[in-house]
């Protein structure tokens, strides 16, 4: 059996590859392949596949990491049991065994222990080498030290059984191999928040039954204008005759996280095809905040208030 790739570029991924690159990686690959050729600018990038995740969680963990990992008294027995585990996966299994999503205090303690384990476990050299190699290629396509978005892409993110969109972390304006490695590990750790673990259990899944891929893509400077989310069907009714757009100022992360109330537009597809006015409904959002590149700290983003007069304007015209 051939060794699975640890990274896949967008031009090699499509919607048939969700098991390896996750929902976000597959969608971006599909967009890059089908839209770039007709003039739509899709930022290029690659996805660290679920094979990288599996390599990480199945690697041996050094005993020394436990010097930096404590645990509250209510789960001290779990920590002591996990110390005897040889791999990250087996230690995480101990941490999450028989977790009760209704016992929030205990679940919070378990989740904190699981994330500490992930953050303290060394990233295998094979993954570091792949990140270095593929990021160098991305720098050649754009410019040295190119700024990227590091975005979680779960294999269960948009499944029919449950939607995991927004459950896991993404990081913006990241630059340099070492920072990408660390942000990749933080994306993996975000699988083990109290919210994500509880959501898995409530939908009849074990947190380790799914894997996570992580997208590394060129940042689009939408903080200088606007961005948002578009659905090619109505997300509430499932009606496939319309496009639903949510738009706000700055980087799109605040829209994705539900932090801001965006402008919304419902666009009639047939109207577009017939060159008729296609907007059948629109609602002006409050758009109170926007996320931009940090003015002083490199490789950081910040949220600022949107001027009142801009809130009363449409972000898309």
Model-predicted regions and their roles:
Residues 242-317:
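Conserved catalytic alpha/beta cores of large enzymes that bind or transform nucleotide phosphates
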Residues 170-272, 276:
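NTP-handling and nucleic-acid-processing catalytic cores
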Residues 1-215, 224, 297, 301-317:
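N-terminal beta-alpha lobe that positions the nucleotide/phosphoryl donor
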């Amino acid at each position: 059996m051939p060794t699975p790739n640890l990274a896949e570029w967008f031009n090699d991924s499509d919607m048939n590859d969700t098991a390896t690159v996750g929902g976000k990686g597959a969608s971006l690959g599909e967009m890059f392949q089908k839209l770039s050729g007709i003039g739509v600018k899709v930022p290029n990038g690659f996805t660290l596949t679920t094979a990288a995740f599996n390599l990480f969680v199945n690697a041996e963990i050094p005993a020394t990491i436990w010097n930096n990992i404590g645990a509250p008294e209510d789960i001290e027995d779990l920590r002591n049991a996990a110390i005897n585990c040889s791999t990250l996966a087996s230690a995480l299994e101990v941490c999450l065994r028989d977790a009760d999503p209704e016992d929030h205090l205990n679940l919070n303690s378990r989740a904190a222990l699981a994330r500490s384990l992930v953050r303290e476990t060394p990233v295998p050299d094979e993954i570091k080498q792949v990140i270095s190699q593929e990021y160098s290629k991305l720098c050649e396509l754009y410019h040295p030290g190119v700024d990227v978005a590091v975005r979680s892409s779960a294999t269960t993110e948009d499944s029919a059984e449950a939607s995991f969109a927004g459950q896991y972390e993404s990081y913006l304006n990241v630059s340099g191999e070492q920072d990408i490695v660390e942000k990749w590990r933080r994306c993996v750790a975000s699988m083990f928040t109290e919210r994500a673990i509880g959501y898995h259990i409530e939908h009849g899944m074990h947190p380790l039954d799914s894997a996570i891929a992580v997208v590394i893509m060129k940042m689009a400077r939408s903080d200088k204008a606007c961005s948002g989310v578009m659905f090619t069907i109505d997300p509430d009714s499932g009606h496939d005759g319309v496009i639903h757009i949510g738009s706000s100022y700055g980087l799109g992360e605040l829209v994705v996280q539900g932090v801001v109330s965006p402008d919304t537009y419902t666009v009639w597809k047939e109207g577009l095809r017939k060159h008729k006015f296609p907007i059948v409904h629109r609602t002006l959002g409050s758009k109170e905040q926007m996320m931009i590149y940090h003015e002083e700290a490199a490789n950081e983003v910040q949220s600022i208030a949107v001027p009142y007069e801009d809130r009363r304007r449409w972000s898309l015209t």
